[in-house]
Amino acid sequence: MENFQGYLEKYEFCQHQCLYPLLFQEYIYALAYDYDLNTCLFSESVDELISYDNKYSSVLVKRLITRMYQQNYLINSVNHSKFNSFIANNHFFYSHFYSQMISEGFGIILEIPFSLEFLSFSKRKKRLKLQNLRSIHSIFSFLEDKLLXFHXMSDILIPYPIHFEILIQILQYWIQDISFLHLVRFFFFEYLNWNTLITSKNWVSIFLKENQRLFRFLYNSYVSEYEFVFLFLSTKSSYLRFTSFGIFLERIYFYGKIKHFRIVYVTSLQRTLWFFTDSFIHYVRYQGKAILSSRGTFLLMKKWKSYLVCFWQYYFHFWFQPNRILINQFFNYSFYFFGYLLSLKKNHLVVRGQILENSVLIDTMNNQLDTIVPVIXLIRSLSIATFXTXSGHPISKPIWADLSDRDILTRFGRISRNLFHYYSGSSKKWGLYRIKFILRLSCARTLARKHKSTVRTFMQKLGGMFLEEFFTEEEQVLSLVFQKIIHFSLHRSNRERIWYLDIIRINDLVNYFELRS
Protein backbone atom coordinates (compact mmCIF):
# COMPACT_ATOMS: atom_id res chain seq x y z
CA MET A 1 0.00 0.00 0.00
CA GLU A 2 2.88 2.36 0.80
CA ASN A 3 4.25 2.00 -2.74
CA PHE A 4 1.16 3.68 -4.18
CA GLN A 5 0.76 6.40 -1.57
CA GLY A 6 2.89 8.79 -3.58
CA TYR A 7 0.72 8.13 -6.63
CA LEU A 8 -2.44 8.90 -4.71
CA GLU A 9 -1.06 12.11 -3.25
CA LYS A 10 -0.72 13.61 -6.73
CA TYR A 11 -4.48 13.94 -7.00
CA GLU A 12 -7.18 15.45 -4.89
CA PHE A 13 -9.10 12.83 -2.95
CA CYS A 14 -12.32 13.31 -4.90
CA GLN A 15 -10.60 13.55 -8.29
CA HIS A 16 -8.04 10.77 -8.23
CA GLN A 17 -7.63 8.21 -10.96
CA CYS A 18 -8.37 4.62 -10.09
CA LEU A 19 -5.53 2.11 -9.79
CA TYR A 20 -6.77 -0.29 -12.44
CA PRO A 21 -4.68 1.06 -15.35
CA LEU A 22 -1.55 0.49 -13.25
CA LEU A 23 -2.48 -3.05 -12.29
CA PHE A 24 -4.34 -4.55 -15.23
CA GLN A 25 -3.74 -2.29 -18.24
CA GLU A 26 -5.49 -3.52 -21.39
CA TYR A 27 -6.98 -6.68 -19.83
CA ILE A 28 -9.92 -4.72 -18.48
CA TYR A 29 -10.95 -3.69 -21.98
CA ALA A 30 -10.29 -7.17 -23.34
CA LEU A 31 -12.55 -8.74 -20.78
CA ALA A 32 -15.31 -6.16 -21.12
CA TYR A 33 -15.40 -6.07 -24.91
CA ASP A 34 -14.42 -9.70 -25.65
CA TYR A 35 -11.34 -8.77 -27.63
CA ASP A 36 -8.30 -10.98 -28.10
CA LEU A 37 -5.11 -10.56 -26.09
CA ASN A 38 -2.18 -9.67 -28.30
CA THR A 39 0.39 -9.23 -25.54
CA CYS A 40 1.66 -11.28 -22.66
CA LEU A 41 1.32 -10.63 -19.00
CA PHE A 42 3.89 -8.14 -17.83
CA SER A 43 5.91 -9.43 -14.92
CA GLU A 44 6.31 -7.88 -11.50
CA SER A 45 7.04 -9.21 -8.06
CA VAL A 46 4.36 -9.73 -5.49
CA ASP A 47 5.99 -7.23 -3.15
CA GLU A 48 5.55 -4.46 -5.72
CA LEU A 49 1.82 -4.98 -5.88
CA ILE A 50 -0.81 -4.13 -3.36
CA SER A 51 -1.57 -7.21 -1.35
CA TYR A 52 -2.64 -6.37 2.19
CA ASP A 53 -5.25 -9.12 2.14
CA ASN A 54 -3.84 -12.64 2.36
CA LYS A 55 -6.76 -14.24 0.56
CA TYR A 56 -7.31 -11.86 -2.35
CA SER A 57 -4.21 -10.35 -3.93
CA SER A 58 -3.99 -8.25 -7.06
CA VAL A 59 -1.67 -10.81 -8.66
CA LEU A 60 -4.32 -13.49 -8.35
CA VAL A 61 -7.00 -11.13 -9.63
CA LYS A 62 -4.99 -10.28 -12.73
CA ARG A 63 -4.28 -13.92 -13.49
CA LEU A 64 -7.94 -14.81 -13.11
CA ILE A 65 -8.96 -12.04 -15.50
CA THR A 66 -6.65 -13.40 -18.17
CA ARG A 67 -7.75 -16.98 -17.58
CA MET A 68 -11.43 -16.07 -17.73
CA TYR A 69 -10.93 -14.24 -20.99
CA GLN A 70 -8.89 -17.04 -22.57
CA GLN A 71 -11.53 -19.58 -21.61
CA ASN A 72 -14.22 -17.38 -23.11
CA TYR A 73 -12.24 -16.80 -26.31
CA LEU A 74 -11.56 -20.51 -26.90
CA ILE A 75 -15.21 -21.46 -26.46
CA ASN A 76 -16.35 -18.75 -28.84
CA SER A 77 -13.77 -19.69 -31.45
CA VAL A 78 -14.64 -23.41 -31.34
CA ASN A 79 -18.43 -23.20 -31.20
CA HIS A 80 -18.77 -20.02 -33.28
CA SER A 81 -21.50 -18.83 -30.94
CA LYS A 82 -22.12 -15.66 -29.05
CA PHE A 83 -22.95 -17.18 -25.71
CA ASN A 84 -20.77 -16.10 -22.84
CA SER A 85 -18.85 -18.69 -20.88
CA PHE A 86 -19.68 -16.92 -17.67
CA ILE A 87 -23.26 -18.12 -17.83
CA ALA A 88 -22.55 -21.47 -19.44
CA ASN A 89 -23.82 -24.33 -17.31
CA ASN A 90 -20.68 -26.41 -17.80
CA HIS A 91 -18.53 -23.65 -16.39
CA PHE A 92 -20.79 -22.37 -13.63
CA PHE A 93 -18.53 -23.43 -10.79
CA TYR A 94 -15.42 -21.89 -12.28
CA SER A 95 -17.28 -18.75 -13.30
CA HIS A 96 -18.65 -18.29 -9.80
CA PHE A 97 -15.23 -18.84 -8.26
CA TYR A 98 -13.46 -16.48 -10.66
CA SER A 99 -16.07 -13.78 -10.32
CA GLN A 100 -16.04 -14.01 -6.55
CA MET A 101 -12.26 -13.74 -6.38
CA ILE A 102 -12.13 -10.86 -8.84
CA SER A 103 -14.91 -8.91 -7.15
CA GLU A 104 -13.21 -9.35 -3.77
CA GLY A 105 -9.88 -8.24 -5.20
CA PHE A 106 -11.42 -5.21 -6.87
CA GLY A 107 -13.20 -4.31 -3.66
CA ILE A 108 -9.90 -4.35 -1.79
CA ILE A 109 -8.20 -2.16 -4.39
CA LEU A 110 -11.07 0.31 -4.37
CA GLU A 111 -10.81 0.65 -0.61
CA ILE A 112 -7.14 1.65 -0.72
CA PRO A 113 -7.63 5.43 -1.16
CA PHE A 114 -10.35 5.44 1.49
CA SER A 115 -8.18 3.46 3.88
CA LEU A 116 -5.30 5.89 3.37
CA GLU A 117 -7.61 8.79 4.07
CA PHE A 118 -8.87 7.13 7.23
CA LEU A 119 -5.33 6.38 8.46
CA SER A 120 -4.22 9.97 7.89
CA PHE A 121 -7.34 11.16 9.71
CA SER A 122 -6.58 8.90 12.68
CA LYS A 123 -2.99 10.16 12.94
CA ARG A 124 -4.13 13.79 13.09
CA LYS A 125 -6.61 13.16 15.88
CA LYS A 126 -5.78 12.34 19.46
CA ARG A 127 -7.46 9.24 20.77
CA LEU A 128 -9.00 9.58 24.19
CA LYS A 129 -8.40 6.44 26.21
CA LEU A 130 -11.04 6.90 28.88
CA GLN A 131 -11.49 3.89 31.14
CA ASN A 132 -14.70 4.77 32.95
CA LEU A 133 -17.12 5.90 30.28
CA ARG A 134 -20.61 4.67 31.01
CA SER A 135 -20.96 3.44 27.44
CA ILE A 136 -17.97 2.15 25.53
CA HIS A 137 -19.57 2.14 22.06
CA SER A 138 -21.04 4.85 19.90
CA ILE A 139 -24.56 3.57 19.35
CA PHE A 140 -25.10 3.32 23.07
CA SER A 141 -24.13 6.96 23.54
CA PHE A 142 -27.09 7.78 21.33
CA LEU A 143 -29.36 5.51 23.36
CA GLU A 144 -28.33 7.20 26.60
CA ASP A 145 -28.70 10.81 25.45
CA LYS A 146 -31.32 12.90 27.20
CA LEU A 147 -33.99 13.78 24.65
CA LEU A 148 -35.27 16.97 26.25
CA UNK A 149 -38.42 18.43 24.66
CA PHE A 150 -38.33 16.03 21.73
CA HIS A 151 -41.83 15.38 20.47
CA UNK A 152 -41.87 13.61 17.08
CA MET A 153 -39.70 11.07 15.35
CA SER A 154 -39.42 9.59 11.87
CA ASP A 155 -38.68 5.94 11.25
CA ILE A 156 -36.93 5.91 7.86
CA LEU A 157 -36.17 2.95 5.62
CA ILE A 158 -33.50 4.09 3.19
CA PRO A 159 -34.64 3.04 -0.30
CA TYR A 160 -32.56 0.64 -2.31
CA PRO A 161 -31.60 1.61 -5.87
CA ILE A 162 -34.05 0.30 -8.43
CA HIS A 163 -31.25 -0.09 -10.98
CA PHE A 164 -27.53 -0.75 -10.65
CA GLU A 165 -26.74 2.11 -13.04
CA ILE A 166 -27.51 4.51 -10.18
CA LEU A 167 -24.60 3.04 -8.26
CA ILE A 168 -22.34 3.40 -11.29
CA GLN A 169 -23.31 7.05 -11.69
CA ILE A 170 -22.45 7.73 -8.07
CA LEU A 171 -18.99 6.25 -8.61
CA GLN A 172 -18.49 8.51 -11.61
CA TYR A 173 -18.44 11.53 -9.30
CA TRP A 174 -15.04 10.60 -7.91
CA ILE A 175 -13.66 7.82 -10.17
CA GLN A 176 -12.47 8.78 -13.64
CA ASP A 177 -11.33 5.34 -14.74
CA ILE A 178 -13.62 4.40 -17.62
CA SER A 179 -12.24 0.87 -17.80
CA PHE A 180 -13.26 0.22 -14.22
CA LEU A 181 -16.80 1.45 -14.85
CA HIS A 182 -17.08 -0.83 -17.88
CA LEU A 183 -15.89 -3.78 -15.83
CA VAL A 184 -18.43 -3.13 -13.09
CA ARG A 185 -21.20 -3.04 -15.70
CA PHE A 186 -19.84 -6.27 -17.09
CA PHE A 187 -20.21 -8.00 -13.74
CA PHE A 188 -23.73 -6.69 -13.29
CA PHE A 189 -24.93 -7.71 -16.71
CA GLU A 190 -23.12 -10.90 -17.57
CA TYR A 191 -22.67 -12.99 -14.49
CA LEU A 192 -23.50 -11.90 -10.96
CA ASN A 193 -27.00 -10.58 -11.72
CA TRP A 194 -26.56 -7.99 -9.00
CA ASN A 195 -29.67 -6.16 -10.14
CA THR A 196 -31.83 -8.91 -8.67
CA LEU A 197 -30.00 -8.66 -5.37
CA ILE A 198 -30.30 -4.90 -5.17
CA THR A 199 -33.98 -4.70 -5.99
CA SER A 200 -34.87 -7.50 -3.59
CA LYS A 201 -36.97 -6.54 -0.59
CA ASN A 202 -34.52 -8.39 1.62
CA TRP A 203 -31.54 -6.42 0.38
CA VAL A 204 -30.21 -5.98 3.91
CA SER A 205 -29.65 -9.74 4.10
CA ILE A 206 -26.76 -9.26 1.68
CA PHE A 207 -24.82 -7.79 4.56
CA LEU A 208 -25.10 -11.10 6.37
CA LYS A 209 -23.33 -13.00 3.61
CA GLU A 210 -19.61 -13.33 3.23
CA ASN A 211 -17.49 -12.31 0.27
CA GLN A 212 -19.73 -9.46 -0.82
CA ARG A 213 -17.04 -6.80 -0.57
CA LEU A 214 -17.64 -5.19 -3.93
CA PHE A 215 -21.36 -4.82 -3.35
CA ARG A 216 -20.77 -3.40 0.12
CA PHE A 217 -18.47 -0.83 -1.40
CA LEU A 218 -21.06 0.19 -3.99
CA TYR A 219 -23.87 0.36 -1.46
CA ASN A 220 -21.78 2.30 1.06
CA SER A 221 -20.90 4.76 -1.69
CA TYR A 222 -24.59 5.21 -2.38
CA VAL A 223 -25.46 5.77 1.30
CA SER A 224 -22.48 8.07 1.82
CA GLU A 225 -23.59 10.18 -1.13
CA TYR A 226 -27.06 10.55 0.36
CA GLU A 227 -25.78 11.42 3.83
CA PHE A 228 -23.17 13.85 2.54
CA VAL A 229 -25.77 15.89 0.65
CA PHE A 230 -28.29 15.51 3.46
CA LEU A 231 -25.86 16.89 6.04
CA PHE A 232 -24.77 19.71 3.77
CA LEU A 233 -28.33 20.87 3.18
CA SER A 234 -29.40 20.39 6.78
CA THR A 235 -26.68 22.75 8.02
CA LYS A 236 -28.33 25.50 5.98
CA SER A 237 -31.55 25.15 7.95
CA SER A 238 -32.15 27.41 10.94
CA TYR A 239 -33.63 24.45 12.77
CA LEU A 240 -30.42 22.43 12.56
CA ARG A 241 -27.63 24.23 14.38
CA PHE A 242 -25.08 21.55 15.14
CA THR A 243 -23.56 21.69 18.60
CA SER A 244 -21.88 18.31 18.97
CA PHE A 245 -21.65 15.30 16.74
CA GLY A 246 -19.08 12.73 15.85
CA ILE A 247 -18.13 9.59 13.99
CA PHE A 248 -17.29 6.41 15.87
CA LEU A 249 -15.81 3.56 13.86
CA GLU A 250 -13.16 2.13 16.18
CA ARG A 251 -13.72 -0.96 18.28
CA ILE A 252 -10.75 -0.79 20.63
CA TYR A 253 -10.52 2.74 21.97
CA PHE A 254 -13.07 4.67 24.01
CA TYR A 255 -14.06 7.96 22.45
CA GLY A 256 -15.63 11.09 23.81
CA LYS A 257 -17.94 13.27 21.74
CA ILE A 258 -16.22 15.85 19.58
CA LYS A 259 -17.40 19.25 18.39
CA HIS A 260 -16.22 19.12 14.81
CA PHE A 261 -17.22 17.04 11.85
CA ARG A 262 -15.18 15.06 9.34
CA ILE A 263 -16.56 12.64 6.80
CA VAL A 264 -14.63 9.38 6.79
CA TYR A 265 -15.34 6.59 4.33
CA VAL A 266 -14.58 3.12 5.65
CA THR A 267 -15.91 0.35 3.45
CA SER A 268 -13.75 -2.48 4.73
CA LEU A 269 -16.09 -2.84 7.69
CA GLN A 270 -19.06 -5.03 6.99
CA ARG A 271 -21.35 -2.53 8.68
CA THR A 272 -20.85 1.20 8.74
CA LEU A 273 -22.39 3.05 11.67
CA TRP A 274 -22.30 6.74 12.55
CA PHE A 275 -24.50 9.40 14.07
CA PHE A 276 -24.68 13.07 14.99
CA THR A 277 -26.66 14.99 17.57
CA ASP A 278 -27.47 18.62 18.21
CA SER A 279 -29.88 20.66 20.25
CA PHE A 280 -32.63 20.48 17.62
CA ILE A 281 -32.38 17.09 15.98
CA HIS A 282 -31.22 13.52 16.61
CA TYR A 283 -30.19 11.30 13.72
CA VAL A 284 -28.75 7.81 13.79
CA ARG A 285 -28.44 5.18 11.06
CA TYR A 286 -27.56 1.52 11.00
CA GLN A 287 -27.48 -0.27 7.63
CA GLY A 288 -30.66 0.72 5.79
CA LYS A 289 -32.65 2.12 8.69
CA ALA A 290 -32.44 5.61 10.16
CA ILE A 291 -34.11 7.38 13.07
CA LEU A 292 -34.75 11.12 12.88
CA SER A 293 -36.22 12.91 15.90
CA SER A 294 -36.76 16.61 16.37
CA ARG A 295 -37.98 19.23 18.80
CA GLY A 296 -40.14 20.71 16.10
CA THR A 297 -43.83 20.27 15.59
CA PHE A 298 -45.56 17.48 13.74
CA LEU A 299 -45.89 19.80 10.73
CA LEU A 300 -42.11 20.26 10.64
CA MET A 301 -41.60 16.50 10.52
CA LYS A 302 -44.04 16.26 7.61
CA LYS A 303 -41.98 18.88 5.80
CA TRP A 304 -38.87 16.77 6.38
CA LYS A 305 -40.70 13.79 4.94
CA SER A 306 -41.66 15.73 1.82
CA TYR A 307 -38.10 16.98 1.51
CA LEU A 308 -36.62 13.47 1.65
CA VAL A 309 -39.04 12.16 -0.96
CA CYS A 310 -38.21 14.99 -3.35
CA PHE A 311 -34.51 14.68 -2.58
CA TRP A 312 -34.36 11.06 -3.70
CA GLN A 313 -36.51 11.73 -6.73
CA TYR A 314 -34.45 14.61 -8.13
CA TYR A 315 -30.98 13.69 -6.92
CA PHE A 316 -30.96 9.92 -7.39
CA HIS A 317 -33.62 9.81 -10.12
CA PHE A 318 -35.91 7.22 -8.60
CA TRP A 319 -39.05 7.30 -6.52
CA PHE A 320 -38.90 7.16 -2.74
CA GLN A 321 -42.12 5.59 -1.49
CA PRO A 322 -43.59 7.93 1.15
CA ASN A 323 -44.82 4.95 3.17
CA ARG A 324 -41.18 4.14 3.96
CA ILE A 325 -41.09 7.15 6.30
CA LEU A 326 -43.27 6.78 9.38
CA ILE A 327 -43.90 9.84 11.56
CA ASN A 328 -45.06 9.21 15.11
CA GLN A 329 -45.31 10.95 18.43
CA PHE A 330 -42.44 9.94 20.66
CA PHE A 331 -44.52 9.31 23.77
CA ASN A 332 -46.92 6.89 22.09
CA TYR A 333 -44.57 4.93 19.87
CA SER A 334 -42.19 2.00 20.23
CA PHE A 335 -39.85 0.96 17.45
CA TYR A 336 -37.13 -1.59 16.69
CA PHE A 337 -33.63 -0.37 16.06
CA PHE A 338 -30.28 -2.11 16.30
CA GLY A 339 -31.89 -5.16 17.82
CA TYR A 340 -33.61 -3.28 20.64
CA LEU A 341 -37.20 -2.31 21.30
CA LEU A 342 -36.99 1.42 22.00
CA SER A 343 -39.51 3.74 23.59
CA LEU A 344 -39.37 7.08 25.37
CA LYS A 345 -39.17 6.90 29.14
CA LYS A 346 -39.90 9.80 31.49
CA ASN A 347 -37.61 10.07 34.47
CA HIS A 348 -38.80 12.16 37.42
CA LEU A 349 -36.37 13.64 39.91
CA VAL A 350 -37.78 15.33 43.01
CA VAL A 351 -35.47 17.74 44.82
CA ARG A 352 -36.31 19.48 48.09
CA GLY A 353 -35.22 23.12 48.19
CA GLN A 354 -35.07 25.33 51.27
CA ILE A 355 -35.80 29.03 50.84
CA LEU A 356 -35.59 30.77 54.20
CA GLU A 357 -38.35 29.17 56.25
CA ASN A 358 -40.17 27.66 53.28
CA SER A 359 -39.49 24.18 51.93
CA VAL A 360 -40.16 23.65 48.21
CA LEU A 361 -40.33 20.39 46.25
CA ILE A 362 -38.96 20.74 42.73
CA ASP A 363 -40.03 18.03 40.31
CA THR A 364 -37.82 17.80 37.23
CA MET A 365 -38.48 15.48 34.32
CA ASN A 366 -36.24 14.35 31.48
CA ASN A 367 -36.80 11.99 28.59
CA GLN A 368 -34.62 8.98 27.98
CA LEU A 369 -34.73 6.14 25.47
CA ASP A 370 -35.83 2.98 27.23
CA THR A 371 -34.02 -0.04 25.78
CA ILE A 372 -36.07 -3.20 26.19
CA VAL A 373 -35.07 -6.74 25.31
CA PRO A 374 -37.41 -7.81 22.44
CA VAL A 375 -38.31 -11.19 23.92
CA ILE A 376 -41.00 -12.07 21.37
CA UNK A 377 -38.71 -11.24 18.43
CA LEU A 378 -35.84 -13.22 19.97
CA ILE A 379 -38.08 -16.24 20.55
CA ARG A 380 -39.18 -16.02 16.92
CA SER A 381 -35.52 -15.96 15.87
CA LEU A 382 -34.75 -18.96 18.09
CA SER A 383 -37.69 -20.75 16.48
CA ILE A 384 -36.30 -20.11 13.00
CA ALA A 385 -32.92 -21.41 14.17
CA THR A 386 -34.68 -24.55 15.55
CA PHE A 387 -33.80 -23.90 19.19
CA UNK A 388 -37.43 -23.56 20.26
CA THR A 389 -40.98 -23.63 19.01
CA UNK A 390 -42.89 -20.51 18.01
CA SER A 391 -44.37 -20.38 21.53
CA GLY A 392 -40.94 -20.56 23.19
CA HIS A 393 -40.89 -24.25 24.12
CA PRO A 394 -37.26 -25.52 23.95
CA ILE A 395 -36.52 -28.32 21.49
CA SER A 396 -33.38 -30.23 20.58
CA LYS A 397 -30.99 -29.27 17.80
CA PRO A 398 -30.70 -32.47 15.71
CA ILE A 399 -28.09 -31.07 13.33
CA TRP A 400 -25.66 -30.70 16.24
CA ALA A 401 -26.26 -34.16 17.67
CA ASP A 402 -23.23 -35.57 15.83
CA LEU A 403 -20.82 -33.20 17.58
CA SER A 404 -18.94 -33.99 20.75
CA ASP A 405 -20.47 -33.10 24.09
CA ARG A 406 -17.94 -30.36 24.65
CA ASP A 407 -18.61 -28.79 21.24
CA ILE A 408 -22.36 -28.80 21.87
CA LEU A 409 -21.90 -27.12 25.25
CA THR A 410 -19.50 -24.58 23.76
CA ARG A 411 -21.83 -23.61 20.91
CA PHE A 412 -24.88 -23.17 23.08
CA GLY A 413 -22.86 -21.34 25.71
CA ARG A 414 -21.37 -18.96 23.14
CA ILE A 415 -24.80 -17.99 21.79
CA SER A 416 -26.12 -17.46 25.29
CA ARG A 417 -23.20 -15.28 26.36
CA ASN A 418 -23.27 -13.23 23.16
CA LEU A 419 -26.94 -12.42 23.62
CA PHE A 420 -26.42 -11.60 27.28
CA HIS A 421 -23.50 -9.30 26.47
CA TYR A 422 -25.39 -7.57 23.70
CA TYR A 423 -28.45 -6.81 25.81
CA SER A 424 -26.57 -6.15 29.04
CA GLY A 425 -27.26 -2.44 28.76
CA SER A 426 -31.02 -2.85 28.55
CA SER A 427 -33.03 -1.18 31.24
CA LYS A 428 -35.13 -4.33 31.74
CA LYS A 429 -33.40 -7.66 31.35
CA TRP A 430 -35.87 -10.08 32.92
CA GLY A 431 -36.84 -11.39 29.49
CA LEU A 432 -33.20 -12.15 28.77
CA TYR A 433 -33.16 -14.82 31.48
CA ARG A 434 -36.04 -16.51 29.70
CA ILE A 435 -33.95 -16.67 26.53
CA LYS A 436 -31.08 -18.18 28.53
CA PHE A 437 -33.43 -20.79 29.95
CA ILE A 438 -34.60 -21.75 26.44
CA LEU A 439 -31.03 -22.18 25.21
CA ARG A 440 -30.01 -24.10 28.31
CA LEU A 441 -32.90 -26.56 28.05
CA SER A 442 -32.41 -26.87 24.27
CA CYS A 443 -28.79 -27.82 24.92
CA ALA A 444 -29.87 -30.44 27.46
CA ARG A 445 -32.41 -31.89 25.03
CA THR A 446 -29.77 -32.05 22.29
CA LEU A 447 -27.39 -33.96 24.55
CA ALA A 448 -30.17 -36.27 25.70
CA ARG A 449 -31.12 -36.93 22.08
CA LYS A 450 -27.52 -37.76 21.22
CA HIS A 451 -27.07 -40.26 24.08
CA LYS A 452 -30.67 -41.51 23.95
CA SER A 453 -31.33 -40.52 27.51
CA THR A 454 -33.57 -38.13 29.45
CA VAL A 455 -33.00 -34.47 30.19
CA ARG A 456 -33.07 -35.04 33.94
CA THR A 457 -30.26 -37.58 33.69
CA PHE A 458 -27.97 -35.20 31.87
CA MET A 459 -28.76 -32.28 34.16
CA GLN A 460 -27.69 -34.39 37.12
CA LYS A 461 -24.63 -35.77 35.33
CA LEU A 462 -23.19 -32.45 34.18
CA GLY A 463 -24.09 -30.43 37.25
CA GLY A 464 -21.93 -27.33 37.76
CA MET A 465 -20.12 -27.64 34.42
CA PHE A 466 -23.41 -27.28 32.59
CA LEU A 467 -24.32 -24.13 34.50
CA GLU A 468 -20.84 -22.68 33.99
CA GLU A 469 -21.31 -22.58 30.21
CA PHE A 470 -24.45 -20.45 30.46
CA PHE A 471 -23.97 -18.14 33.41
CA THR A 472 -20.99 -15.81 33.44
CA GLU A 473 -20.22 -13.99 36.65
CA GLU A 474 -21.12 -10.32 36.16
CA GLU A 475 -18.18 -9.24 38.29
CA GLN A 476 -15.75 -10.90 35.89
CA VAL A 477 -17.32 -9.21 32.88
CA LEU A 478 -17.51 -5.78 34.47
CA SER A 479 -13.88 -6.00 35.55
CA LEU A 480 -12.95 -5.89 31.84
CA VAL A 481 -14.62 -2.48 31.54
CA PHE A 482 -13.89 -0.84 34.86
CA GLN A 483 -10.61 -0.70 36.73
CA LYS A 484 -12.13 -2.03 39.93
CA ILE A 485 -14.73 -4.71 40.43
CA ILE A 486 -18.18 -3.39 41.29
CA HIS A 487 -20.51 -5.67 43.19
CA PHE A 488 -24.09 -5.68 41.93
CA SER A 489 -27.04 -7.45 43.37
CA LEU A 490 -29.34 -9.34 41.05
CA HIS A 491 -32.04 -6.67 41.37
CA ARG A 492 -29.64 -3.83 40.63
CA SER A 493 -28.00 -5.62 37.72
CA ASN A 494 -31.41 -5.88 36.08
CA ARG A 495 -31.61 -2.08 35.96
CA GLU A 496 -27.95 -1.20 35.38
CA ARG A 497 -27.03 -0.01 31.88
CA ILE A 498 -23.52 -1.32 31.20
CA TRP A 499 -22.48 -2.11 27.63
CA TYR A 500 -19.53 -4.25 26.67
CA LEU A 501 -20.30 -5.77 23.28
CA ASP A 502 -18.44 -5.11 20.05
CA ILE A 503 -21.15 -3.34 18.06
CA ILE A 504 -19.64 -4.16 14.67
CA ARG A 505 -20.28 -7.88 15.10
CA ILE A 506 -23.99 -8.38 15.53
CA ASN A 507 -25.50 -11.75 16.29
CA ASP A 508 -27.32 -13.31 13.36
CA LEU A 509 -30.42 -13.76 15.50
CA VAL A 510 -30.58 -10.01 15.99
CA ASN A 511 -30.35 -9.32 12.25
CA TYR A 512 -33.21 -11.70 11.52
CA PHE A 513 -35.96 -9.68 13.16
CA GLU A 514 -34.31 -6.41 12.12
CA LEU A 515 -35.25 -7.39 8.55
CA ARG A 516 -38.87 -7.84 9.56
CA SER A 517 -39.36 -4.87 11.86
UniProtKB/Swiss-Prot annotation:
The keyword RNA-binding applies. This is Maturase K. GO terms for cellular component: chloroplast. HAMAP family: MatK. Belongs to the intron maturase 2 family. MatK subfamily. PANTHER family: MATURASE K. It is found in: Plastid, Chloroplast. The keyword RNA-binding applies. GO terms for biological process: mRNA processing; RNA splicing; tRNA processing. Keywords: Chloroplast, mRNA processing, Plastid, RNA-binding, tRNA processing. GO terms for molecular function: RNA binding. It comes from the Eukaryota. InterPro entries: Domain_X, Maturase_MatK, Maturase_MatK_N. The gene is matK. Its main location: plastid. Usually encoded in the trnK tRNA gene intron. Probably assists in splicing its own and other chloroplast group II introns.
